[in-house]
């Protein structure tokens, strides 16, 4: 919204992590969970364990019958990325690119830009750059000994004496969701989720919501999940049941 007041275009670095090897925390954990004898299924499961912030231990109990949640269907979706002659880390690259980037980050960012009538400038996601980046050898993307990624991009920055602007460690974009939960996140979730439309319509398990929503000492994974459910509920009321105005302010 702020960018809209300054320009009709928004520059984005989307694709940098997926194409040039930026998710070093994931690569390191994946390598500790797998070995040369790991099967494609075992690697798919290990890959999911590298996304611990995106799930809760009792994930399968969160969904209602209408969602038809199944770990087996998720494994089936992922296993192809790990059933090929690529090296283990290159398999993770493949899964990352075909997962969150294509079906999460890119669609969401596009919708947000469309909402504010803006256009994205994403040079790393041009056809030419994607084609080029996919052919870069692994040793020019990730150093597993030092656990440093984006080696080609770092070399480019060094060439122009700009490497001091970055750190060797991958810094994720993180919001302190626990503080958000304690300040007003929990009360908002209670307001919208205790009698939620997504639970009434069978997408989310009402018993799961009731079990955790009043707890004050929730693990951050549950906090993150509740905030995600709040977003789902708001979207559902806006576009499915249509009993909520787009001008409504959450307070």
Regions found by a protein language model. Give the residues of each.
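Adenosyl-5′-phosphate
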Residues: 5-11, 38, 42-251
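A mobile, often basic/glycine-rich helix-loop segment
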Residues: 20-45
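Short, well-structured alpha-helical segments in soluble
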Residues: 1-3
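Short acidic/histidine-rich active-site segments
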Residues: 7-23
């Amino acid at each position: 919204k702020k960018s809209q007041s300054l320009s009709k275009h928004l520059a984005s670095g989307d694709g940098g992590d997926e194409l040039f090897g930026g998710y070093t925390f994931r690569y390191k954990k994946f390598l500790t969970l797998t070995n040369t004898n790991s099967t494609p299924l075992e690697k798919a499961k290990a890959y999911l364990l590298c996304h611990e912030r995106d799930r809760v231990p009792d994930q399968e109990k969160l969904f209602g019958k209408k969602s038809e949640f199944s770990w087996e269907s998720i494994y089936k979706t992922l296993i192809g990325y790990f059933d090929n002659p690529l090296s283990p880390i290159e398999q993770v690259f493949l899964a990352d690119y075909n997962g969150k980037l294509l079906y999460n980050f890119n669609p969401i960012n596009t919708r947000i830009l469309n909402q504010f009538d803006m256009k994205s400038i994403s040079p790393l996601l041009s056809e030419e750059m994607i084609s080029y980046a996919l052919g870069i050898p692994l040793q020019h993307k990730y150093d597993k000994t030092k656990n440093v990624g984006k080696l080609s991009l770092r070399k480019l920055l060094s060439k122009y004496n700009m490497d001091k602007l970055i750190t060797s460690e991958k810094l994720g974009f993180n919001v302190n969701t626990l503080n958000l939960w304690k300040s007003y996140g929990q009360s908002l979730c209670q307001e919208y989720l205790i009698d939620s439309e997504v639970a009434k319509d069978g997408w989310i398990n009402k018993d799961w919501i009731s079990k955790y929503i009043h707890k004050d000492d929730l693990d951050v994974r549950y906090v993150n999940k509740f905030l995600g459910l709040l977003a789902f509920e708001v979207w559902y009321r806006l576009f499915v049941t249509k009993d909520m105005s787009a001008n409504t302010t959450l307070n």
